[in-house]
Amino acid sequence: MKNRVISLLMASLLLVLSVIVAPFYKAEAATVVNTPFVAVFSNFDSSQWEKADWANGSVFNCVWKPSQVTFSNGKMILTLDREYGGSYPYKSGEYRSKSFFGYGYYEVRMKAAKNVGIVSSFFTYTGPSDNNPWDEIDIEFLGKDTTKAQFNWYKNEVGGNEYLHNLGFDASQDFHTYGFEWRPDYIDFYVDGKKVYRGTRNIPVTPGKIMMNLWPGKGVDEWLGRYDGRTPLQAEYEYVKYYPNGVPQDNPTPTPTIAPSTPTNPNLPLKGDVNGDGHVNSSDYSLFKRYLLRVIDRFPVGDQSVADVNRDGRIDSTDLTMLKRYLIRAIPSL
């Protein structure tokens, strides 16, 4: 957040975090992940993630509701909408990991919400609710101008490290990758595989949870602009990655969109394109899952062999796994 806003609201925010959020979390031994972690948001994985069901108060003019975190077509969707009969005028979604993550490279593929007065985010956080100091690293999109991303971080409650990066595109129009590499003496921020900013002062040290949320501001019009009450608004997320050893091969996911494989023979059907639209993307992944669950008995393409992505003569879960690895860029082609 803006330093000028934090200076005015720090005390109330800390009080709300400790009084309101803490009761919803029981103190447990922290599980810190130290191996590569990839989450593709095709469905709700309650073993790894949780949907918030409380209110932060202070500058957050909404209550978090599990109903506002949904999954469709290979995406996790956070929806900001009206809340009737409650203590807050709006409800929205927050999704957070159950485990903690420390130094390493973090990446998300997402599409931000666009509207004055709101924030779409990807960040790590720990604080009083986890019996830890407040340490946080943020990538935020202010809905009033989604051609920019705001980077920030906190160490032991001290922020004021905001940097506003001009993206060169509108983050609300398409999916792009955003990431940061967190090390003891610096944080490097990435956009579509390119390092765009390095921070070196007051670097946080405490492992935190991976979080995403969408919220309307209250009392921070100078920062976000005055929210006009427009609903519904959505931020969408395709995946999250974490690599403790840093940026994979010194090059995070470089491509802002999922490009289809190009067959050697252009007359051959495109492997993995099970819906026949000429592209291989999350819609094919969702359709493939329905086939394996026997919700459908065939794919809507003439040549069913497009689903045999590993070319072993069978269509099974091995093909789905390979398709998933392609979509998260773990393999370059099918």
Swiss-Prot record:
Catalytic activity: Hydrolysis of (1->4)-beta-D-glucosidic linkages in beta-D-glucans containing (1->3)- and (1->4)-bonds
Keywords for the protein's UniProt record, in alphabetical order: Glycosidase, Hydrolase, Signal
Residue ranges annotated for the Dockerin domain, each copy included: 267-334
Name of the top EC class for this enzyme: hydrolase
Signal peptide positions on this chain: 1-27
Ranges where the record places region Disordered: 246-265
All copies of domain GH16, residue ranges: 28-248
Pfam families to which the protein is assigned, alphabetical: Dockerin_1 (PF00404), Glyco_hydro_16 (PF00722)
CDD domains (alphabetical): Dockerin_I, GH16_lichenase
Entry's Gene Ontology molecular function annotations: licheninase activity
Catalytic site positions: 136 (nucleophile), 140 (proton donor)
GO BP field: polysaccharide catabolic process
EC number: 3.2.1.73
Domain of life: Bacteria
UniProt feature coiled coil, ranges: none
Family, as annotated: Belongs to the glycosyl hydrolase 16 family.
Name of the featured protein: Beta-glucanase
Biological source species: Acetivibrio thermocellus (Hungateiclostridium thermocellum)
Encoding gene (name): licB
